[in-house]
Amino acid sequence: MSGEGEIELLEAEERVVVVPPTQTAERIDRFLAGAMPDLSRAQVQRLIEQGFVLYDGRSPRASQPVRPGAVIQLTIPPPIPTELVAEPIPLDVVYEDADIAVINKPAGMVVHPAPGHPRGTLVNALLARYPDLAIGGELRPGIVHRLDRDTSGLLVIARHDQAMRSLVDQQQARRMRKIYQALVIGRPPETGTIDAPIGRDPRDRLRMAVVPDGRPARTHYRLLDTFGDYSLLEVQLETGRTHQIRVHLRHLGYPIVGDPVYGPRRSHLHLSRQFLHAAYLGLVHPRSGRWQEFTAPLPADLQIVLRQLQDRASYH
């Protein structure tokens, strides 16, 4: 590298995004982070700061509002060598081949190393199992989508760049299907759709909330069972905003049991994390083009809670 903080261009990837005619005047960093699920907003901001983004041929600021019809050019640098450590952490591998891997992530496991979590993450475990995984730099995480630390369930991993592009395209086109199970307080209608924009909570920037100027977000749910004051839901994401299911269900008035951020302060159920599990994942295989489906049963801690509720109901 030619200097500290700079990115050496070896085999850079060029991308072009045309702002759609219906797009509102949103900040360019937020717009690009939403348009490209494989890049976080912080990564987009870094690209902008280092001159790897052009807006109608000029270098923008991160706060630049986008306009319909504008052309945005991005240069995605190659992976940055990191100090990531491969750790032989056991993984529940639901499926693997030369192109993808599907992992059943346990609750409590962080997906990416971050300040405070340099070890013991899913990425550390993946590097031990797949030494050739294209995951080396922060701009190429290799992981197509994320789950919160205390959400369990299915994640798909791209084992090379071609698979990554295919899976990201499926996410952007909303062809990838993700279904969760959530236990909530209250009894919602049997089916419903929550169509409400999500953004940073203006009262607490560490939380997300339904806000008028947020990014479009849509969640579908179906009632599976009821246990007194509690309901088990099947939840399907149409979009993938941060904390979307947790925020939307709280907004609807049915917070997730055990959610330390968006749930009730007290619960009579002894659960150390939110009752949210990614139970189903459907996608088109990047190489074969065939539709594949994967499932993961509820983990033991969530099954215990359901049995407790079933036992209570049988006594009344």
Swiss-Prot record:
What's an example GO BP annotation here?
enzyme-directed rRNA pseudouridine synthesis
Q: Extract the signal peptide range.
A: none
Per its record, the protein catalyses: a uridine in RNA = a pseudouridine in RNA
Q: GO terms for molecular function, please?
A: pseudouridine synthase activity; RNA binding; rRNA pseudouridine synthase activity
Record has Glycosyltransferase as a keyword: no
User: What top-level branch of life does the organism fall under?
Assistant: Bacteria
Cross-referenced InterPro entries, in alphabetical order? PsdUridine_synth_cat_dom_sf (IPR020103), PsdUridine_synth_RluA-like_CS (IPR006224), PsdUridine_synth_RluC/D (IPR006225), PsdUridine_synth_RsuA/RluA (IPR006145), RluA_PseudoU_synthase (IPR050188), S4_RNA-bd (IPR002942), S4_RNA-bd_sf (IPR036986)
Q: Which residues form the S4 RNA-binding domain?
A: 26-98
Q: What class of enzyme is it?
A: isomerase
- Keywords associated with the record: Isomerase, RNA-binding
Q: Which residues form the active site?
A: D148
Matching entries from PROSITE patterns are given as: PSI_RLU, S4
User: Which Enzyme Commission number(s) are on file for it?
Assistant: 5.4.99.-
| PANTHER family with a match to the protein in the record | MITOCHONDRIAL RNA PSEUDOURIDINE SYNTHASE, RIBOSOMAL LARGE SUBUNIT PSEUDOURIDINE SYNTHASE D
Q: Which family does it belong to?
A: Belongs to the pseudouridine synthase RluA family.
Write down what this protein is called: Uncharacterized RNA pseudouridine synthase Caur_0901
